Amino acid sequence: MAGHFKNFLWKWRGVAITTPAISLVVIGLRLIGALEPVELAMLDQFFRWRSPETTDSRIVIIGIDEADVRQYAWPIDDALLAQLLDKVRQQKPRAIGLDLARDKPVGTGYSQLASLFKSTPNLVGATKIADLVSSNFAITSSNIEPPPALPAEQIGAINLPVDADGRIRRGLMALGLPDGKIATSFSLQIALLYLDG
């Protein structure tokens, strides 16, 4: 019996040495992050190979483009923003996301805008939380405060982790803050409002 085992080991000695050695090298390379650029390139390629997704007609995105900026100037005046949000609110959407920095009054009409913020429970405002660092990514930026008239439960963080190659491949659902609190992401806040409606 011992002779068979020795013969088996001798016959397969190359595989018995090579397999664990290659496994250890690959594990080591993964641990130090040497394979990450290749993995990210493959992930990007897989996304390019996917078939295009259909657009959901129930979701409408209203953007501010260059023509709007030329016509109305930037930043958009509070009175104009209040008019726009009121028109959107009249359509009775399940959720409204305002992905604009609105931490201080702009132009005229702040009282209108603040009143609209307080009377629209399905409106989510944006905030950006600065200098969050974890083992996988770093977000270094300055704070963008949320609109002061919005209640805390109607505010979502717009932080996005940037990979080492400068691309954004992930979104966050929530952020752990240094004081132990959790900040829900802007997109999750809107999704929860939409699904609750």
Regions found by a protein language model. Give the residues of each.
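Non-transmembrane functional regions of envelope-associated proteins
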Residues: 2-197
